[in-house]
Amino acid sequence: MTTFKAILLGIVQGLTEFLPVSSSGHLAVTQHLLGVPEDRILFLTILLHVGTLFSVFFVYADDIFMICKEFILMIVDLLTGKGIRVNNQYRKLGLLIIVATIPTGIIGLFFKDLFTSFYNSTLIIGISLLVTGTLLWTAEKVNTGKRDIKDMNWFDAVIVGLFQGLAITPGISRSGSTIVGSLFRGFNKELATKFSFLISIPAILGATVFEVKDVLEVGLGDFTLTMLIAGVLASFLSGVFAIRTLINFIKKEKLYYFSYYTWTVGSIVILFSLL
């Protein structure tokens, strides 16, 4: 393992975590090309996820601060006998993030082993990439939603959470699936994008907790402090770039551009799986 490889893995993690192209598949391919066994870099992988989390905190700092503030105030209201008062958009958004996380967590807990087994099938990965591309294309072409946060309800959050849960399938993009799920529910593009990135926080945190258990079993690995810092910084910076790039693409109604990429990669993967 070298610092250069750590930086390259960080860049791939940051870009593909938030661009709708499936991060798991790209990271696995990159590890293979670099000749780095997955079990030897689990600790680095966890830190790269932390770097991408910082990306979301950086881009949506104001929203996250207000959500946390209002959530604390809502708990204070509850403890002082005022009940749960959802009297502003940040309180509502915070509760809906929790609701969306529930189906995601259930799928992750009970079906993780099943979906993980799909990593052994390049055919399934290729087909999943084609599905991702088709969803992105369809959502961009047929959606005319204008629903805002005031129009959201718990059922919307559950549906988007289910989309996020199914994204543990290798080849299915988490950001792509949640944005598509939001657009299918009629959200406006700004809300669909924001909600997708905000619900990624508990999802990434949860996945990271599961990975910590694996790290304790295989060890931290042979890394220098320079390697770790370089990798995390690379994942953070590339993550910020990816989030802002995706926001720009969605504003310009060019989300379907990513369809061409996932269709191409998916077709290549399927072709190789059949050879």
Swiss-Prot record:
Uppermost EC category: hydrolase
Chief location of this protein within or outside the cell: membrane
Compartments in which it is found: Cell membrane
Pfam family of the protein (one): BacA
This protein's record includes keyword Glycoprotein: no
Membrane topology, as annotated: Multi-pass membrane protein
Any one GO molecular function term: undecaprenyl-diphosphatase activity
Biological processes annotated in GO: cell wall organization; peptidoglycan biosynthetic process; regulation of cell shape; response to antibiotic
Keyword terms of this UniProt record: Antibiotic resistance, Cell membrane, Cell shape, Cell wall biogenesis/degradation, Hydrolase, Membrane, Peptidoglycan synthesis, Transmembrane, Transmembrane helix
InterPro entries on file: UppP
EC annotation from Swiss-Prot or TrEMBL: 3.6.1.27
Record-annotated membrane-spanning stretches: 1-21, 41-61, 95-115, 118-138, 192-212, 223-243, 255-275
Catalyses which reaction(s): di-trans,octa-cis-undecaprenyl diphosphate + H2O = di-trans,octa-cis-undecaprenyl phosphate + phosphate + H(+)
Listed GO CC annotations: plasma membrane
Note: Bacitracin is thought to be involved in the inhibition of peptidoglycan synthesis by sequestering undecaprenyl diphosphate, thereby reducing the pool of lipid carrier available.
Entry's family note: Belongs to the UppP family.
Function: Catalyzes the dephosphorylation of undecaprenyl diphosphate (UPP). Confers resistance to bacitracin.
Protein name: Undecaprenyl-diphosphatase
